[in-house]
Regions:
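N-terminal leader/targeting and accessory segments in enzymes
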Residues: 1-74, 78
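Phosphate-binding loop of NTP-binding sites
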Residues: 41-44, 53-167
Length: 167
């Protein structure tokens, strides 16, 4: 909403109530809320869909959005679009959190403005508005988060290891 975009919140859970959603998300007071189904007409209004973390990309409604040519982003892509500074990204099957934390501490010895974000529990989107060109972001990126990136292009990336469950 701050960027001038029209925001539509959608949840396929028909048991949800709009009032409950608005209470949990007071910052989305101007957003349109759709619950249950999304029509073909409503799909035509969408330019971009940002999936909440944990929403599978193979859900029928997401597949329908992809088939309609709508860009599908995750939280990482949305944050990257609005962040500044250099990004160091860590992915792989095991050791991501330890490596991300260690690299974050090393970077803090070198730079004042360091953000450790991503799958480590600190949302990238919360840190992005605070960043400057001098900032360094150390991001733990899961295999699921990699499915919903488009332009995310870290300055440095590391793939720690890959086991069959991540292929």
């Amino acid at each position: 909403e701050k960027s001038g975009a029209t925001v539509i919140l959608f949840d396929g859970n028909e048991k949800l109530h709009e009032e409950a959603i608005r209470m949990k998300l007071p910052s989305a007071s101007k957003a349109q809320i759709l619950i249950g189904q999304i029509s073909d007409e409503q799909l035509k209004e969408l330019d971009l869909v940002v999936l909440s973390p944990g929403v599978p990309t193979d859900l029928p409604v997401v597949e329908k959005m992809k088939a309609a040519g709508i860009r599908i982003w995750g939280e990482v892509e949305l944050a990257y679009e609005n962040a500044k500074g250099d990004v160091l990204a860590i992915t792989g099957t095991n050791g991501k959190t330890t490596t991300t934390s260690l690299l974050g501490e090393i970077m803090k010895c070198w730079k004042e403005s360091v953000y450790v974000v991503g799958n480590i529990g600190n949302p990238y989107t919360q840190a992005a508005p605070k960043m400057t060109e001098e900032s360094v972001t150390v991001a733990e990126i899961s295999s699921f988060q990699l499915e919903t990136i488009d332009q995310f292009h870290p300055k440095v990336s590391a793939i720690l290891n890959i086991t069959p469950d991540h292929l």
